[in-house]
A protein has these predicted regions:
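Conserved catalytic-core segment of NTP-binding enzymes
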Residues: 115, 121-204
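NTP-binding/hydrolysis catalytic cores, primarily Walker-type P-loop NTPases
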Residues: 217-260
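Short, hinge-like loop/turn segments at secondary-structure boundaries
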Residues: 51-56, 158-159, 186-189, 221-223
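P-loop/Walker-type NTP enzyme "switch/lid" segment
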Residues: 36-111, 214-218
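Walker A/P-loop phosphate-binding motif and the immediately C-terminal alpha-helix
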Residues: 2-40
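Residue-level signature of catalytic and energy-coupling elements of molecular machines
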Residues: 12, 38, 46, 61, ...
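Short, well-ordered alpha-helices that flank and scaffold nucleotide-derived cofactor binding pockets
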Residues: 21, 25-29, 133, 157, ...
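Beta-strand-loop-alpha "switch" segments that mediate conformational coupling across diverse proteins
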Residues: 195-223, 236
């Protein structure tokens, strides 16, 4: 059975897409069959981080009735990229019916995948909540800043109230060290659990690094760089492995691959 995992965030600029791309690539290089759905429709940029020229996107499923197989782009590592489309205004305001069509279109890939990673739109929009809740598990990326905490809380609250999603995992990005990352996580967990009946799980952390910024400019995933700092190699590996083992969370609404 394919496991679907949403990578989400309460706000943009916290490293969500970078984490989604690098973890998807890492899992692929370890022998798993992985697809990355860039669900940040209309503003998708996973293909840029992967240096992949795209021909078709999710928009072509909706507008041209293309099969999902014609939208999947193979990358050199074996990762299957499903681009969300960039600069397509129609994709910015998809209604629930079109979101359902996209989710159901991936059913055709269920025998070809082990893991689906979904890079969701930042924030607590209807699209972000629905695509996140359609996954078996949700990972929220936050940074040690009050605004990140506030926006991540708003997203988790929407996910809980609208979709009965009662468990999320957290990755702390741009942390000074492991101790600081866990302190940020503990502080955020206290805020969430004080007001919401949501289980929290610390999935891992990443330090601030010029290598990450450089990999984005170079259009090459950081985990493929031989010169990547050992701490980043270690932490990306741990987060990716934790993603593969993350427990399924029950929620209401439509699910990828009809998983319940």
């Amino acid at each position: 059975m394919v496991r679907s995992i949403a990578i989400a965030s309460g706000k943009g600029g916290v490293g969500k897409t970078s984490l989604a791309v690098n973890c998807a690539v890492k899992l692929t290089t370890e022998g798993r069959r992985v697809a990355l759905l860039d669900a940040d429709f209309g503003m998708a940029n996973s293909h840029i981080l992967l240096d992949k020229k795209i021909e078709n996107s999710v928009n072509d499923i909706l507008e041209k009735n293309l099969n999902i197989e014609k939208v999947v782009h193979e990358t050199p590592t074996g990762l299957k990229l499903i681009p969300g489309g960039s600069g397509v205004l129609e994709l910015l305001n998809l209604d629930s019916q079109k979101r359902w069509e996209i989710i159901r279109s991936l059913d055709a890939l269920k025998n070809d995948l082990d893991i689906l990673v979904v890079d969701t739109p930042a924030g607590a929009s209807d699209a972000s909540v629905e695509f996140s809740a359609a996954c078996d598990a949700v990972v929220v990326v936050l940074v040690p800043e009050p605004t990140s905490f506030m926006d991540a809380y708003s997203f988790i609250k929407a996910l809980y109230l609208e979709k009965k999603f009662e468990s999320v995992s957290i990755v702390v990005n741009l942390a000074k060290n492991e101790k600081a990352a866990k302190k940020s996580y503990d502080s955020f967990k206290k805020i969430v659990t004080k007001f919401l009946n949501v289980d929290m799980n610390f999935l891992g952390w990443l330090p601030e690094s010029k290598s990450i910024a450089g990999s984005i400019v170079a259009r090459k995933p950081a985990v493929l760089q031989k010169s990547l700092e050992p701490i980043l190699q270690k932490n990306f590996s741990e987060i990716a492995n934790n993603l593969a083992k993350i427990e399924t969370v029950k929620s209401s609404g439509v699910k990828f691959f009809n998983n319940k």
